[in-house]
Design a protein with these regions (language model features):
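An N-terminal, well-structured beta->alpha segment
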Residues: 3-103, 193, 198-229, 514
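Gly/Ser/Thr-enriched, mixed-charge loops and adjacent short helices
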Residues: 29-40, 151-285, 289
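Conserved phosphate/anionic-ligand binding catalytic regions in large, soluble enzymes, centered on
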Residues: 36-56, 143-146, 236-244, 248, ...
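Short glycine-rich or small-residue beta-strand-to-loop segments that form or flank ligand, phosphate
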Residues: 85-91, 231-234, 243, 409
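N-terminal small/polar loop signature for handling phosphorylated ligands or for N-terminal nucleophile
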Residues: 87-150, 251, 255-310
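Short Gly/Thr/Asp-enriched flexible loops that form oxyanion-binding sites at enzyme active sites
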Residues: 99-107, 150-157, 307-328, 362
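Glycine-rich phosphate-binding loop plus the immediately following alpha-helix
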Residues: 156-187, 326-349, 354-365, 419, ...
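Phosphate-binding and adjacent anionic-ligand microenvironments
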Residues: 292, 296-298, 319-321, 339-534, ...
Length: 572
């Protein structure tokens, strides 16, 4: 069906709400094509898109269609899955509560139990709720750190991790089989609340989550001595982190936490920031201002659904250093392993997990403590799968998992990135370095001196719409078929094609990769540096990752600059 035919189907539907009809009427031809040329697809983390009318937008009909697919998947299982039900949470975005209760209404029409949070909650708490309530699945309405015009829909499996590939593929099949999203039936929400089929949850689950999060901090004595007076500035960037982060920090003994109050209110427009993304230093503007006023040692920011955390640390000159996701991962891993080693609690079979595009510095740190590093595809569900595997086989003890995109998980009572846990570890880290008369910035430098000057850079290029999708395909094809034989005058030693599941050495030897197929290419160089390229699974972007190791910070930065210039020239 052409985009014009899809558009006309929506125009002809008489039950369309006024706000969506107005959206249709205001579309120019280019917008119309982008909104209707395809269906919003599930990526590494469910589906995410612009809010509005269209098959390639997120709206009540696309949400109903996705949930109808989930309901059919649940019914196909044939056991007690309907009774176990689905936990549903949502963030602070436009239409998030509506999408959550639309999902519950579709499930209820099928006689499927749902537990819906009474108000906004973090993604990690949804993951926890699935496990705590023994649900079959979970739905999180969020677009994570995307700008305000976006929303999204993530599906979780019974282990609390994002739905694994097998079930996700089955779910996609069920969703695609639904030809008319306008025909999806919904139950009356208030009636089903009264009958108990839709159950509203809240504080009781918060309390259980906060009980579990107590175990994240390793050294309570250290916190008692150096954490009480340590000044921390926290901002939830208008999102869900405010629901739990402040309480978790107070419970752990961090009494001098200052919150950026202008960003503590839920605001779907994220009015005080250009983008509510803690990866971007611009999101820290108000936190830096407050930090200077109160003399804060560390600034922490969580994204709207509180699964990612950004960190800035005080430097000797009084300015704040913005840490990369890889630097946060490295300093966390070093501290967790060292603290457990000092306490005599480091297991012999200790294991860490990271994505294939995250820094090798953490691998080197892990190995120095006798721990094993497991590399997985991008998407935290693959780390959740590893945790499940460790539990089933009893072969490794999970210590920490992370992705360079500012996602961390310490304790596996949650099976997705958890910024609340990460905030607690960052606060303890700051207390640890303070106890030594140092800052977190000093800690990063110590790691570089011990393990080498690792540096990384991620370049994200946004290519929207039909043309953008074609450009992304063309760039991937060019890298796959005509990539250079060297980068920065350094020979490529291995090319890993995760789509073909092959690793090809310079001498032509080919080995098979054991990870599931994924559209990622990675080039490892003779000096240990690497370049990776992949399309984003959730946004119209292509991402280039550069990772190097050098003799000094200047050496590493020069290598990155050279490789970045070569990538730009190659892509043109």
């Amino acid at each position: 069906m052409t985009y014009q035919e899809n558009y006309q189907k929506w125009v002809d539907f008489t039950g369309l709400p006024d706000y969506l009809r107005q959206d249709l009427e205001n579309m120019d031809e280019k917008t119309k094509e982008d909104a209707f040329y395809t269906n919003l697809e599930f990526g590494t983390a469910g589906m995410r898109g612009l809010i509005g009318a269209g098959t390639n937008r997120i709206n009540i009909y696309v949400v109903r269609q996705a949930t109808e697919g989930l309901a059919r998947l649940i019914e196909s299982k044939g056991g007690n899955e309907k009774e176990r039900g689905v936990a549903i949470a949502y963030d602070s975005r436009h239409f998030s509560p509506e999408f959550a209760f639309e999902s519950a209404a579709v499930l209820a029409k099928h006689g499927i139990k749902s537990y819906v949070f009474e108000s906004l909650r973090p993604t990690p708490e949804l993951s926890f709720a699935v496990r705590h309530l023994n649900c079959f699945a979970g739905i999180m309405i969020t677009a994570s750190h995307n700008p305000a015009p976006f929303n999204g829909y993530k599906v979780y499996g019974e282990d609390g991790g994002q739905m694994p590939p097998h079930d996700a593929d089955a779910l996609t099949t069920y969703i695609r089989a639904i030809e008319n999203p306008f025909a999806v039936e919904v139950a009356d929400v208030e009636a089903k609340k009264a009958s108990g089929l839709i159950e509203v949850i809240g504080e009781a689950v918060d309390v259980e989550y906060l009980k579990e999060v107590k175990d994240v901090n390793i050294n309570p004595t250290l916190i008692e001595e150096f954490g009480k007076d340590m000044k921390i500035v926290y901002t939830p960037l208008h999102g869900t982190g405010e629901m739990l982060a402040r309480r978790a920090l107070a419970q752990a003994g961090f009494d001098s936490v200052q919150v950026v109050e202008a960003q503590a209110t839920a605001d779907p427009d994220f009015s005080t920031v250009k983008s509510p993304n803690p990866e971007n230093q611009a999101a820290f503007a108000l936190a830096e201002e407050l930090g200077r006023q109160v003399g804060a040692d560390v600034l922490v920011a969580t994204d709207p659904d509180a699964d990612r955390v950004g960190v800035e640390v005080l430097q000797k000159d009084g300015s704040y250093l913005n840490l990369s996701g890889n630097q946060i991962g490295a300093i966390m891993a070093k501290y967790i392993l060292e603290a457990h080693k000092s306490a005599g609690t480091l297991p012999e079979n200790a294991a860490l997990c990271k994505s294939i595009v995250s820094t090798d510095l953490v691998t080197k740190i892990a190995e120095s403590y006798g721990a094993t590093m497991f590399n997985v595809l991008t998407g935290f569900k693959f780390i959740a799968e590893k945790i499940q595997e460790f539990e089933e086989k009893h072969n490794h003890t999970y210590m920490m998992g992370f992705e360079e995109s500012f996602g961390y998980l310490i304790k596996p009572f949650v099976r997705d990135k958890d910024a609340i846990q990460a905030v607690l570890v960052v606060a303890e880290l700051a207390a640890y370095y303070r106890s030594r008369g140092l800052t977190l910035a000093d800690g990063i430098e110590e790691i570089y001196k011990e393990y080498g000057y690792y540096a990384e850079k991620t370049i994200s290029v946004t290519l929207s719409g039909v043309d953008g999708a074609e450009q992304i395909k063309a760039i991937m094809a060019k890298f796959r078929n005509n990539a250079p034989k060297e980068w920065n005058t350094t020979a490529i030693t291995v090319v890993e094609d995760f789509k073909a599941q092959t690793a090809t050495a310079a001498d032509g030897t080919v080995t098979t990769l054991t990870t599931p197929p994924s559209d990622v290419l990675k080039y490892t160089l003779a000096d240990g540096s690497w370049i990776a390229v992949r399309p984003s699974g959730t946004e119209p972007k292509i991402k280039f990752y550069i990772a190097v190791v050098g003799e000094s910070n200047e050496d590493s930065q020069a290598k990155i600059a050279n490789i970045e210039a070569e990538i730009n020239a190659f892509v043109k």
